[in-house]
Amino acid sequence: MDDTKTASPAPARAYETPPAERPITDAEAARAAALSANEHIKIASGYLRGTLADGLLKHATGAISEDDGQLVKFHGMYLQDDRDLRPERTRKKLEKAYSFMIRLRIAGGVVSPRQWLALDDIARTYANGTLRATTRQTFQYHGVIKSNLKRTLQAIDAVLLDTIAACGDVNRNVMAATNPAQTGAHAAAYRLAKDISDSLLPKTNAWREIWLDGERVAGGEDEAAEPVYGRTYLPRKFKTVVAVPPSNEVDVFAHDLGFIAILDKKNALKGWNVTVGGGMGMTHGEPDTFPRTADLLGFCEPADALKVAEAVMTVQRDWGNRKSRKNARLKYTIERYGLAAFRAEVERRVGKPLREPKPFQFTGNGDRYGWVEGEDGRHHLTLYVPSGRIRDVEGGPRYLSGLRRIAEIHEGDFRLTGNQNVIVANVPAGARAEIDRLVAEYGLTIGAGALRRNSLACVALPTCGLALAESERFMPDLLTRLEERLAAHGLRDEDITVRMTGCPNGCARPFIAEIGFVGRGPERYNVYLGAAFDGSRLSKLYADDVAAADIPALLDPLFAAYARERIPGERFGDFVIRAGYVARTVNGPDFHDRTGPLRAVA
């Protein structure tokens, strides 16, 4: 764990006084012109119904209305278009090539073989023929056209899955540690993730009404009230994870709310350290937006974890900024009111004080590849999936077909990791040989080079409307060039975290990678260095607006210096700080301070 988490506290600073009561009542919200546009959309939506049902019947367009485009996120979807086709369609005076991205809610990332087969069928029938494992332990479909939305969601529902709250201003998909060697701890983490997901799920019946042709609740929207969320839901997205040391593969410090398992010497659960206020997104050129690593709030007993989760979320519901969405995440709420005031209000709502955090140690945030035997004697195979894209590559690995064949004979389950990989889990010893045969037959990858196995990339172009540059499509080529530079300095087998996003919203968590690339414009990136290998420290901007072709040459001298000057066991992110190439980021507010190279590379 990065030592900045236990450093001496900063000098006292002045914080604003928290509101005494919930600031947004329905009556206030309805007439408050100062609220962001999204707040008015939520208030008028009838608990997330809007005009979605009518919009699906408008066959003259592949899109939906702008307001419904915000509401459909709560249902687990984003309206997108193929940006590669925009110029041609504009020239022909055609509408954009609209389609929808659909994201599932899969708490803890666990699916059965039956569910896997159904999800595979959906990908081939209604989407673009691929499954995309995300950085938050679930699946996304891309390329689903409006006329297929209902069919797709009904097929998902048929195998007891859904997309409710996978996006939007709610508690989103809850992640859980997947370390297969720690069977008991994983089970505890998974149970908590499931319980939080179910407990904080929106209660509106809108999803079933619209997508499954369910009946409207008697009495209409007034009886479909949200007892926790209310009409306005949360000010912004809210992300929750459950981690089990020593692995931080869920990147607990990058999320709004985290639970870190504290285990005894027999790996039995003693309780949870609670973290609050992490988040990656920011906006280029706006220093009042920044990534932030979470603070340790305290320790809670296992029986209190659900109460703590709801309390943290509802304090954010009541204290969060509903006027400016760019400053609406929990990280800004804590910066505004202070951790002490936030903790006091959480404790008041829980009904008891939190204890002080317990010691723990993370050693990294990557996955363990290959076969691992769990404490219960079951076996687990972690497969490397480049950028999480499960597809068949002509002349290369056939992930879609290979994993389908495994699902047809597998008796355990599948687990998605926060690093976009897939675990074939709970395999009896006698079934390993057949799975190994299928892995070899379909060219699936058990491992990868050191740089690739520690890499992440978001989707970006052509479907993401926010992307400023390529990510998933460019990352493999860039990794090849960086691997060549590392090999030249004897560093081919050095584990270094490297992540890329097409914009600064940070879906692939680039600001806690030792090397982070963030899209600035077409074929141009900001380069960030100096994060901790275990995900506990933010990086710092090293070079601004770098041409994609120049990135290897920019980093090569640093690789050479690292090979010459590192001390035994020193990670690359720690080295560039110790050697004076970049400043250490203590936390979010100073992320934009002292940027750029502090000295030239010898």
UniProtKB/Swiss-Prot annotation:
[4Fe-4S] cluster binds at C458, C464, C503, C507. Pfam families: NIR_SIR, NIR_SIR_ferr. Alpha(8)-beta(8). The alpha component is a flavoprotein, the beta component is a hemoprotein. InterPro entries: CysI (IPR011786), NiRdtase/SiRdtase_haem-b_fer (IPR005117), Nit/Sulf_reduc_fer-like_dom_sf (IPR036136), NO2/SO3_Rdtase_4Fe4S_dom (IPR006067), NO2/SO3_Rdtase_4Fe4S_prot (IPR045169), NO2/SO3_Rdtase_4Fe4S_sf (IPR045854), NO2/SO3_Rdtase_FeS/sirohaem_BS (IPR006066). GO terms for cellular component: sulfite reductase complex (NADPH). Belongs to the nitrite and sulfite reductase 4Fe-4S domain family. Keywords: 4Fe-4S, Amino-acid biosynthesis, Cysteine biosynthesis, Heme, Iron, Iron-sulfur, Metal-binding, NADP, Oxidoreductase. Residues 1-23 are annotated as: Disordered. Binds 1 siroheme per subunit. Component of the sulfite reductase complex that catalyzes the 6-electron reduction of sulfite to sulfide. This is one of several activities required for the biosynthesis of L-cysteine from sulfate. The keyword Iron-sulfur applies. Siroheme binds at C507. It is an enzyme of class 1 (oxidoreductase). It comes from the Bacteria. It comes from Methylobacterium sp. (strain 4-46). This is Sulfite reductase [NADPH] hemoprotein beta-component. GO terms for biological process: cysteine biosynthetic process; hydrogen sulfide biosynthetic process; sulfate assimilation. Its cofactor is siroheme; [4Fe-4S] cluster. It catalyses: hydrogen sulfide + 3 NADP(+) + 3 H2O = sulfite + 3 NADPH + 4 H(+). GO terms for molecular function: 4 iron, 4 sulfur cluster binding; heme binding; metal ion binding; NADP binding; sulfite reductase (ferredoxin) activity; sulfite reductase (NADPH) activity. The keyword Ribosomal protein does not apply. Its EC number is 1.8.1.2. The gene is cysI. Pathway: Sulfur metabolism; hydrogen sulfide biosynthesis; hydrogen sulfide from sulfite (NADPH route): step 1/1.
